[in-house]
Structures are given as structure tokens and as C-alpha cells.
């Protein structure tokens, strides 16, 4: 509802909470590719995008659905480990296209320390695509899914029925949640092998 003669109606995507146009404008001024991370309740997708007068140009992209279809991922599509792997996949494709540097674009996500979106940015840096990020990245244990495995192990011992109910989808896919870190490493190795990249040294 209008609030006076000087009130300016925000653009539709800003009203819908999809785009911060001021942030987008400042990124455009940098003339650097953007490392874009977006997520839904079920999936995450990462794109490396260049600004162009005729419209944004997608240089590389990856969706967490690909992890399942191409690399045998059995975990959740929007879990922290899946975000990392999706970011890694997009970054490797960007590097293959000749991109060496990008600015982070997390949209309207709050820059909370340890947030899932920063797992994708950490993955990019781990494989050699420079994307500036501070000390907000999740720690290595959470990226590997150790928090999921630990909780599952505890729940299995204390309440087997609740364990079966809560992790029903994973168990149906043939993944014991206690094996999340092992499964993460297996899928990560497949992605790196696919792009002929040696296992990167990880940082905490």
C-alpha cells in the first residue's frame, strides 16, 4: 500500500524476496563473474554468471539433482555436504571454461557463520576457483556430514523407532546415516576423478 507521494513501489522480484537490486548493481560494477548460490527446501543450485549488456550469461552451473543422477549421491539434496559437492561441481566447470575468480552472490540469504551457502564457496576455493570469503565457512566435520552421522548413531541407540522414521528416506536409498561422511568422500572422489583433479588439501 502506498505511503505518500514519494513512495516508490519496489520491483516485483524485490517484493518477492528474490533479488537485492542494489547488491546486484554493485556486483555489476566489479565486472567480475558471480558465484551464485541458491537453495530450496529440497535442492541447491550453483551458477557462475557473467554480466553482459544483453543479459546475464551463465558460464557454468550445477544442481544437486546431478549428484544423485551422475555420481550416485544418496544423501539429502540440500544438506550441507550436498551444497559443498554442488559448489565443487560448478567451480570445476567454471575453471574448465577459463574462469579463475568470481565474487560471491548469496542473494538474500543472511551471511550467518557456518551457513550452508558458504559450503559451496569453500568448495570453489578448495578446487582453485578463487571466491572471496571470510571465516564464515562451515568446519570440515560438518561439510563431511559428521554431525548427521553422530546424531543418527545416538538416536539409533536411544530410540530405534524414531531413527527409522526420521531417516526413512536415506535408508530407502540404501544409505545408513551413520555412513554419511564415508559416502560424502566417495562421491567427492568421483567428481574429482571425473575432472581429473587430485584430492585437494582441505582447510578447517
UniProtKB/Swiss-Prot annotation:
Keyword tRNA processing on entry: no
Domain of life: Archaea
SUPFAM superfamilies documented for this protein: Translational machinery components
One GO biological process term: translation
InterPro entries in the cross-refs: Rbsml_uL18_euk
GO (cellular component) term, any one: cytosolic large ribosomal subunit
Assembly information from the UniProt record: Part of the 50S ribosomal subunit. Contacts the 5S and 23S rRNAs.
Family recorded in the similarity comment: Belongs to the universal ribosomal protein uL18 family.
HAMAP family (alphabetical): Ribosomal_uL18_A
Role played: This is one of the proteins that bind and probably mediate the attachment of the 5S RNA into the large ribosomal subunit, where it forms part of the central protuberance.
UniProt-recorded name of the protein: Large ribosomal subunit protein uL18
Origin species: Ignicoccus hospitalis (strain KIN4/I / DSM 18386 / JCM 14125)
